[in-house]
C-alpha cells in the first residue's frame, strides 16, 4: 500500500475556497481509483494556518499511474482545478509517495 501525501500552501484568507475544493474532489478521486484517507484543513490552534494536507491511498505504483491518468481526465476534477486556480486559494502544492511503517509481529 502506498499513500499519496499532498501538502498545500494556501491563502488562509481563502480557506473556504480550499475547503470547497477539497469537498468537491472526493467523488472524482474515488471514481478514479484513489482511497481518500482525508483532507486536512489548518486550524488556529497549532501549526501554520497556510498549510493544508491530503492523503490518498493506492495499492501499487501501477494503480497510482492509472489513478493519475483517470483523475486528470475526470471532467469534475478538471472543473474543480479550474475553479481553485481562479480563486488563488492554493499558492503551491507538494506531493510525495509514502509508505506506512507497521510494527513487526511479536516474536520476530
Report the location of each language-model feature.
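Short, well-ordered beta-strand segments in beta-rich or mixed alpha/beta enzyme
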Residues: 2-9, 38-72, 107
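Residues that cap or initiate secondary-structure elements
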Residues: 12-14, 60-62, 102
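Short, surface-exposed ligand-recognition loops at beta-strand->loop->(often short) alpha-helix junctions
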Residues: 10-20
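Long, low-complexity, Ser/Thr/Gly/Pro-rich intrinsically disordered segments that act as flexible linkers
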Residues: 91-108
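An amphipathic, aromatic/His-enriched active-site/gating alpha helix that lines ligand/cofactor pockets
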Residues: 20-38, 57-95
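Glycine-centered flexibility motif
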Residues: 13, 34, 45-47, 88-89
Amino acid at each position: 500500500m502506498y499513500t499519496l501525501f499532498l501538502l498545500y500552501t494556501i491563502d488562509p484568507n481563502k480557506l473556504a475556497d480550499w475547503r470547497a475544493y477539497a469537498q468537491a474532489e472526493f467523488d472524482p478521486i474515488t471514481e478514479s481509483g484513489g482511497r481518500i484517507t482525508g483532507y486536512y484543513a489548518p486550524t488556529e490552534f497549532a501549526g501554520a494556518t497556510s498549510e493544508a494536507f491530503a492523503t490518498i491511498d493506492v495499492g501499487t505504483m501501477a494503480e497510482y499511474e492509472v489513478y493519475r491518468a483517470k483523475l486528470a481526465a475526470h471532467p469534475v476534477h478538471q472543473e474543480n482545478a479550474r475553479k481553485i486556480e481562479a480563486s488563488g486559494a492554493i499558492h503551491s502544492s507538494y506531493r510525495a509517495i509514502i509508505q506506512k511503517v507497521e510494527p513487526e509481529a511479536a516474536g520476530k
